[in-house]
């Protein structure tokens, strides 16, 4: 570890790998709410928040587990399709509260083309919430709908490996080849619930 009078100990949340204070400062100074996307191995959280001296105030939030509980989502809760639907849900809730513009906050996630965080931001833009994002970083419509999973499942079915790879989908009563139509069905349920 470094020694000497010029050594500066990083703040606790920076040491823990949770907060980039420089980016957070730049977003707070903008004066706009933040569209926060966080992911774990199993779930995705999307929040719209404003910063206050006493702490952040959450205006609207959505969790990918809500897709299963409220809208009948049968696929995984941490894939590109789930990220899009969770972002759509959070954006519609934020629009109900009067938020029209937000700055993207992807935290310490690397900004890789086609990443889940950009699927959630694309959903917000599609819902009508303005969140700036370069068009080339968002995943394609085919990938968001899960068509790559459906085509992969068809190959596995021919080889007899479908039950091994997609056991969770099959246990939930969803054929992996039907994921694009199931995605559209759940998306329409969300839009109908918020009258859009």
Swiss-Prot record:
GO MF terms, alphabetically ordered: 5S rRNA binding; structural constituent of ribosome
Cysteine pairings via disulfide bonds: none
Cited Gene3D superfamilies: 3.30.420.100
InterPro entries: Rbsml_uL18_euk
Keyword line: Ribonucleoprotein, Ribosomal protein, RNA-binding, rRNA-binding
Leader peptide range in chain numbering: none
GO CC terms in record: cytosolic large ribosomal subunit
Listed GO biological process terms: ribosomal large subunit assembly; translation
Similarity field: Belongs to the universal ribosomal protein uL18 family.
Subunit details: Part of the 50S ribosomal subunit. Contacts the 5S and 23S rRNAs.
Stated role: This is one of the proteins that bind and probably mediate the attachment of the 5S RNA into the large ribosomal subunit, where it forms part of the central protuberance.
Protein name: Large ribosomal subunit protein uL18
Organism in which the protein naturally occurs: Desulfurococcus amylolyticus (strain DSM 18924 / JCM 16383 / VKM B-2413 / 1221n)
Gene responsible for this protein: rpl18
